[in-house]
Amino acid sequence: MQNSFSLEEFIEEIFNIEKYEQKVKSAKLKNELLNNNIVENRITITDIDLMSGVQFEEFLCEYFNGQGYQCSTTKASGDQGNDLIAKKGELTIAIQAKCYSGIVGNHAVMEAVAGMKYYSANRCMVITNSTFSKSAVELAKANGVILWDRQVLTEKLNEV
């Protein structure tokens, strides 16, 4: 018995093969992009701008864990001015995270200093996706508080 195809069936079969080949090419390209283009998976400052405060804290904790720290979030209320504690060897950093659209003022710096003492940390930081007021920068300098503003945070994101 001989298989016979009509011209229409033959054309349809060729069309199906071409569709299948296109799907394979698309899948290969997608896989190549995902495996070779790590930049596509990076978090950008724009992504951070869309985060909630809690998401920003969780992101920062993951960032510090990736830098070799053991980082944990503090309890949401009564955190004594800090959102994260990052430890690496003898170094303990109390971190205040501010995911804001406005300017971060003195209060965040004061909270970081208070939290550093409360958590017996060696250092303290305030990290924001925004900017700091001039007086916050002066207060931080006088108290040894490390400040990461939008520019520094963007640089850190590009290093990862």
Language model: regions and residue ranges:
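Mixed-charge (Asp/Glu-Lys/Arg
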Residues: 1-160
